[in-house]
UniProtKB/Swiss-Prot annotation:
Region (A): 186-297
Primary location group: nucleus
Gene: NEMP1
Origin organism lineage: Eukaryota, Metazoa, Chordata, Craniata, Vertebrata
The UniProt record lists the keyword Nucleotidyltransferase: no
Gene Ontology cellular component annotations, sorted alphabetically: nuclear envelope; nuclear inner membrane
Residue numbers bearing the Phosphoserine modification: S368, S424, S425
Region forming the signal peptide: 1-43
Natural source organism: Pongo abelii
Protein name: Nuclear envelope integral membrane protein 1
Annotated region (B), positions in chain: 336-405
C-alpha cells in the first residue's frame, strides 16, 4: 500500500525456532516487527476520495471513500428537511461514517480497534446515512464483502414526513398529557404496546426481583438488558422482512403478549392516586417536549417553539384573568345605555308567558312529595278549587274572567278612551271661552 514501509529482518543468531540463543535475536525480531507496525500505522496514506453532489448517482464496483460538502445555509422552511446519503448495493456492504478526510486516513491505518470494530459493524445492502443540516462535511467509507458487488451512492435532500409526525406527536403529548393520563384507552393501549415491544426487558426485570443481592448473576442480567436492546433494534430494522417471511409467528407473538399485557393492566387498573396521575402527566409532557425538539432540524427554532408552548400552557389562566379584567374596564369606561322599554303588546305577551310558567311550576310543586297537602288545604278557603287547579283546571272562575275583561279588557279600554276624549273636549271649550270673558271685562 502507498506510504507503507518494508522491514527487512535478519535471521536470528543461535539455535531454536525463535533464535533465543546468543545475542537475543528473538527479542530483536519482535521489536523490529512492532516497530514496523508502528511505522506502518503512522505513515501518511493517500486516500482517493470521491466528492458527492446532490441528486447525482455515483456507481462503483470496488471499495471507495466518499465525502459530501453541505454549502447551503438552513432556512426557516427547512425545519422538516432531511439530508441523507443512500448506499444501495446488489450484495452486502459495510458502511462507515466519519467527519472528514483525516478520519478516513485513520481508517486506512492499522489499529487494534479498527481491526475488531470491522467485525462488529453491520453489513447491509441498502442503508441511509443521515447528514446534519449544519454539518459542513460528512465522509463515509464503503467496503465490499464479496467480489462483483455493484453499489450506488446518492445524496438526497427532501421533506421528511417522519419528522413532521414526531413533532405532531410531541404537541399532542404536551397539550393533552393531562387528559391522556386519565384516559383508560390510553392506559391499556400503552401497556399493551410496552408489553409487546419490551417483553424481553420485562422478563429480565422480573427475574432480577428474585435474584439475591450482591450476586454475580447481575452481570448476566446487565448483559441480558444490552442483548435485549440490540434484539429490539435489529427487529425494527428488519420488521418488513420478518413480517413477509414469518408473519404467522409474529402475529401469534403479538396476540399472546398483547393479551398478557392487557391482563396485567386490567389486574392493577388505571391510576387513581392524584400524585401518580400528576407524575404521569409531567412525564408525558416532558416526552412531548423531547419529541418536539427532535422533530425539528433547526435547534433555535425548536427552542423557540418549545418556549411558546410552555408559555401557552402555563399562562392559560393568567391570560383569561387579564381578558376578563380588560372586559370589565371597557364596560366601566363605556357610557351606560338606557334600557329599551317594552311596548304594550310585548308587555302583555311577556306577562302571559311568565304567568303560565309560574302556574306550571306551582302545579309541579303541589304534586311533589315536598308539598305538605294537609297543611296547604288548612290554609285555603276553597280546597275543591285548589284540587281542580292541581289536576289541571284553570286558576280563574268564569265570573273572575268576565270581571277582568270588563275592567282591563277591550271594552274597558274603549270606555276609558271615550272618557278621556270627553274630558279633553271640555277642557278645550273652557279654554276657548276664557279669552272672550277676559275681553268683555277689559272693555267694561
Amino acid at each position: 500500500m502507498a506510504g507503507g514501509m518494508k522491514v527487512a529482518v535478519s535471521p536470528a543468531v543461535g539455535p531454536g525456532p525463535w533464535g533465543s540463543g546468543v545475542g537475543g535475536g528473538g527479542t530483536v525480531r519482535l521489536l523490529l516487527i512492532l516497530s514496523g507496525c508502528l511505522v506502518y500505522g503512522t505513515a501518511e496514506i493517500d486516500v482517493n476520495v470521491v466528492m458527492l453532489q446532490e441528486s447525482q448517482v455515483c456507481e462503483k464496483r470496488a471499495s471507495q471513500q466518499f465525502c459530501y460538502t453541505n454549502v447551503l445555509i438552513p432556512k426557516w422552511h427547512d425545519i422538516w428537511t432531511r439530508i441523507q446519503i443512500r448506499v444501495n448495493s446488489s450484495k452486502l456492504v459495510r458502511v462507515t461514517q466519519v467527519e472528514n478526510e483525516q478520519k478516513l486516513k485513520e481508517l486506512e491505518q492499522f489499529s487494534i480497534w479498527n481491526f475488531f470494530s470491522s467485525f462488529l459493524k453491520e453489513k447491509l445492502n441498502d442503508t441511509y446515512v443521515n447528514v446534519g443540516l449544519y454539518s459542513t462535511k460528512t465522509c463515509l467509507k464503503v467496503e465490499i464483502i464479496e467480489k462483483d458487488t455493484k453499489y450506488s451512492v446518492i445524496v438526497i435532500r427532501r421533506f421528511d414526513p417522519k419528522l413532521f409526525l414526531v413533532f405532531l406527536l410531541g404537541l399532542m403529548l404536551f397539550f393533552c398529557g393531562d387528559l391522556l393520563s386519565r384516559s383508560q384507552i390510553f392506559y391499556y393501549s400503552t401497556g399493551m404496546s410496552v408489553g409487546i415491544v419490551a417483553s424481553l426487558l420485562i422478563i429480565i426485570f422480573i427475574l432480577s426481583k428474585f435474584m439475591p443481592k450482591k450476586s454475580p448473576i447481575y452481570v448476566i442480567l446487565v448483559g441480558g438488558w444490552s442483548f435485549s436492546l440490540y434484539l429490539i433494534q435489529l427487529v425494527f430494522k428488519n420488521l418488513q422482512e420478518i413480517w413477509r417471511c414469518y408473519w404467522q409467528y409474529l402475529l401469534s407473538y403479538i396476540l399472546t403478549v398483547g393479551f398478557m399485557s392487557f391482563a396485567v393492566c386490567y389486574k392493577y387498573g388505571p391510576l387513581e392516586n392524584e400524585r401518580s396521575i400528576d407524575l404521569l402527566t409531567w412525564t408525558l409532557q416532558l416526552m412531548g417536549l423531547c419529541f418536539m425538539y427532535s422533530g425539528i432540524q433547526i435547534p433555535h427554532i425548536a427552542l423557540a417553539i418549545i418556549i411558546i408552548a410552555l408559555c401557552t400552557k402555563n399562562l392559560e389562566y393568567p391570560i383569561q384573568w387579564l381578558y376578563i379584567t380588560y372586559r370589565k374596564v371597557c364596560k366601566a369606561a363605556e357610557k351606560p345605555v338606557p334600557p329599551r322599554l317594552l311596548t304594550e303588546e310585548e308587555y302583555r305577551i311577556q306577562g302571559e308567558v311568565e304567568t303560565r310558567k309560574a302556574l306550571e311550576e306551582l302545579r309541579e310543586f303541589c304534586n311533589s312529595p315536598d308539598c305538605s297537602a294537609w297543611k296547604t288545604v288548612s290554609r285555603i278557603q276553597s280546597p275543591k278549587r285548589f284540587a281542580d287547579f292541581v289536576e289541571g283546571s284553570s286558576h280563574l272562575t268564569p265570573n273572575e274572567v268576565s270581571v277582568h275583561e270588563q275592567e282591563y279588557g277591550l271594552g274597558s279600554i274603549i270606555a276609558q278612551d271615550e272618557i278621556y276624549e270627553e274630558a279633553s273636549s271640555e277642557e278645550e271649550d273652557s279654554y276657548s271661552r276664557c279669552p272672550a270673558i277676559t275681553q268683555n271685562n277689559f272693555l267694561t
